[in-house]
Amino acid sequence: MIQKSRPALLQHQDVGDRVETLMLQPVIKAFLCGSISGTCSTLLFQPLDLLKTRLQTLQPSAHGSRRVGMLALLLNVVRTESPLGLWKGMSPSIVRCVPGVGIYFGTLYSLKQYFLRGHPPTALESIILGAGSRSVAGVCMSPITVIKTRYESGRYGYESVYAALRSICHSEGFRGLFSGLTATLLRDAPFSGIYLMFYSQTKNVVLHRTDQLDAVLVPVVNFSCGIFAGILASLVTQPADVIKTHMQLFPMKFRWIGQSVTLIFKDYGLRGFFQGSVPRALRRTLMAAMAWTVYEEMMAKMGLKS
């Protein structure tokens, strides 16, 4: 009996050793650090994402009527749906952001190790690395992004993530899960590239001019550089975000990017491409700044260079 059980025990130990070895891989550590940082930022800033989606999909106001602002919309959501209504769509957001941010940071770490081999990236290299990493994450998480957008809009009554997947596949086919993917990549890839470029270059300038920076101030510097980079990147990519939202919510009407641009301009004018810019800039800036700050701190604790 003892001799028969030993191979199974040894096999179990081998599997355990493989799992332990895998968890020690730097790329896996980068993925885990990114996932944890994504969880923190998503939980805190989900209300801003919901307000952004609602503002972008408001019906055009009649001539002379007062436009609905972010504060008025926030109060309306709290009044009609309760304060927890601000966290509507939390489940798909977590499902998307946690692995999505992990995939982004894991891919970024791998690309840095392969192409840069330890030297800091130039401005152009930062743009390429950030855009490439975000594109990989965007394609992987596109189905969840579609579901998240529809959850937050309040126009769909999905009972669960599985019910949403089944409904979309039944009514729109598998292709429906990738509605607005091109617009998403046109928004996210430039955002991540521009963000990483501003973030890394700004941080290099600050750290270069400061010979000895107190360790306590390092997260503050990282967060401040993240805020600056996020604001600039958000403004540049706002029109693509509006187009993406309309294509994901109304795929039968907004079928391709050129048509979407024409329809949005016809209904809302040039201002329509910047609807929801305030909550989006706040959310993207704060989320990215927090994600990078938490990520870099965790990577430093693990003895890895981010």
UniProtKB/Swiss-Prot annotation:
It holds the Pfam family Mito_carr. It is found in: Mitochondrion inner membrane. The keyword Nucleus does not apply. It is a multi-pass membrane protein. It comes from Bos taurus. One of its GO terms (molecular function) is glycine transmembrane transporter activity. The keyword Transferase does not apply. GO terms for biological process: erythrocyte differentiation; glycine import into mitochondrion. The gene is SLC25A38. Solcar repeats lie at residues 25-114, 121-205, 217-301. GO terms for cellular component: mitochondrial inner membrane; mitochondrion. This is Mitochondrial glycine transporter. Mitochondrial glycine transporter that imports glycine into the mitochondrial matrix. Plays an important role in providing glycine for the first enzymatic step in heme biosynthesis, the condensation of glycine with succinyl-CoA to produce 5-aminolevulinate (ALA) in the mitochondrial matrix. Required during erythropoiesis. Plays a role as pro-apoptotic protein that induces caspase-dependent apoptosis.
